[in-house]
């Protein structure tokens, strides 16, 4: 099986590949944390996922560089970089053994870019923090996905993650009431935990840490992972696109 790229537009891969987009145009919503932990999960179960870092901050790429040789292998593409020694198509090629592609998107993705970004995504994970500012930005993101990218609710491609929550707070209750009105599944509610900080420092994910240390956090992740596993049973789109070129 081969995966060939067509310029900057995208790549064609096997039908067995699952593409997961982690998206929220607002910075600081936890996209990289979710993307790296997803890649870690797939790697820990014996897959060889591809983590594509489209964020100029390069946080996912730095995380990958911290990983030790004995850790489960994760392919990485620093998509935000421009390498003058190779073509863009060669730089963006998708490894033939990558069953999962996790895309860490940058902040400030424009509404008009959403149709191209989301077209071939099997799952679009949208994290949101429990704050008024974040909820407002998240609302616009969801509206853009539904109205501009034309992602239909009945496709069940969008999954919301309530991130860094403290369940006994008023703002958390407000967030959950708001999410209930959207008719879009909340696939995970992740607590505000120092385990994510430790994992980032070590270049690993929760699923690679000692279970007794992260048991509660692993339980938080299980609904989202079950949602993604259910999608693996369905045939994903053939086209695997990268983010559009930026000036």
Q: What does each model-identified segment do?
A:
Residues 12-16, 23-29, 36-119, 200-204:
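P-loop/Walker-type NTP enzyme "switch/lid" segment
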């Amino acid at each position: 099986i081969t995966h060939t790229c067509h310029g900057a537009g995208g790549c064609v891969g096997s039908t067995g590949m699952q593409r997961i987009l982690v998206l929220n145009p607002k910075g600081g919503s936890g996209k990289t944390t979710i993307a790296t932990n997803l890649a870690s999960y797939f790697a820990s179960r014996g897959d060889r996922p591809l983590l594509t870092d489209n964020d100029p901050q390069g946080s996912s790429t730095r995380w990958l560089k911290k990983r030790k040789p004995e850790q489960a292998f994760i392919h990485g593409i620093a998509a935000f970089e421009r390498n003058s020694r190779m073509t863009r198509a060669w730089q963006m090629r998708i490894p033939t053994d990558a069953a999962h592609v996790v895309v860490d998107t940058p902040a400030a993705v424009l509404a008009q870019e959403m149709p191209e970004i989301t077209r071939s995504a099997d799952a679009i994970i949208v994290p949101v923090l429990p704050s008024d500012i974040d909820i407002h930005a998240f609302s616009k993101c969801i509206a853009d996905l539904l109205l501009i990218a034309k992602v239909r609710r009945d496709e069940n491609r969008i999954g919301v993650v309530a991130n860094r929550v403290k369940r006994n707070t008023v703002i958390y209750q407000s967030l959950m009431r708001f999410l209930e009105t959207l008719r879009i599944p909340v696939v995970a509610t992740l607590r505000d935990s120092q385990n994510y900080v430790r994992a980032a420092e070590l270049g690993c994910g929760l699923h690679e840490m000692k279970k007794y240390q992260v048991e509660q956090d692993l339980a938080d992740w299980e609904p989202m992972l079950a949602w993604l596993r259910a999608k693996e049973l369905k045939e994903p789109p053939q086209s695997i696109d990268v983010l559009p070129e930026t000036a």
